[in-house]
Amino acid sequence: MSTLALIVEDDEDLASIFAEALHGVGFTVEHVTDGRSAEERLKKGDPPFLILLDMHIPHVSGGDLLVNVIKKEEHLAKTMVIITTADARMGETYGEMADFVLIKPISFVQLRDLTSRLKPKDA
C-alpha cells in the first residue's frame, strides 16, 4: 500500500515541518503550494494515501478542492484527508468531509503522533 502523503500548504516553513514529521514516521512526501497545482496533481498520477490540506491556499481554496476534486474523483475515494486551518469555524464547516481536522498552530509532535497511527501497518 502507498505511503505517499501530499502536503497542500502555501507556507513553506510550515510545509517543511509537516514533511519532517511525515518522513519521520515513514511517509514519502510531495508538496504543492497552491490549489491549482494540487488539483492538477490529484487528477493525474497515483493517489496519495494521505492529503494534508491547508484550507487557505492560493488560486483554488482548500474547501473548493475538498468539495470539487477530492470527494468527486473516484480514484481518491480511499485517500485520507487531514485539513489544517487556523479558523475553527472552517474546521467545523468542512470537518465532516475530512478524516481529521487540525487547528493551527500545529506542533511537530502532534502531527507526527497522529500520522504514525494512520500509516498502513503493511508499509
Locate the predicted segments by residue.
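Conserved acidic carboxylate
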Residues: 9, 85
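Two-component/phosphorelay signaling modules centered on CheY-like receiver
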Residues: 11-30, 100
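Acidic, metal-coordinating helix/loop segments flanking the phosphotransfer/catalytic sites
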Residues: 31-50
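Active-site residues of response regulator receiver
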Residues: 54-56
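The feature encodes the CheY-like receiver
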Residues: 58-60
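Alpha4 helix (beta4-alpha4-beta5 surface) of REC/receiver domains from two-component response regulators
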Residues: 64, 86-103, 109, 113
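Short amphipathic alpha-helix used as the core "switch/output" element in two-component signaling
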Residues: 64-77
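The C-terminal output helix
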Residues: 116-123
